[in-house]
Amino acid sequence: MLIPHHLLEAETLTRLIEDFVTREGTDNGEETPLESRVLRVRQALERGEALILFEPDSQQCQLVAKRDVPKEWLD
């Protein structure tokens, strides 16, 4: 299930983004400040390039690129 980012409380969204950008394997080998990485993801959400996917079975949220979401989920 896709969750519109604007429906989340600001603090919840920030924590979700911070969790995503600090996961192992998400850095690009550079020492980019956390604030910059959070801002990039927030902007991608606002542009619709990234989406929040909630999986009810596992009760997990994840950020995904829109291009990786099945087209039928976007209708």
Swiss-Prot record:
Domain of life: Bacteria
Matching SUPFAM superfamilies: YehU-like
Pfam families, per database record: UPF0270
Family (UniProt): Belongs to the UPF0270 family.
Name of the protein in question: UPF0270 protein Avin_35000
Organism: Azotobacter vinelandii (strain DJ / ATCC BAA-1303)
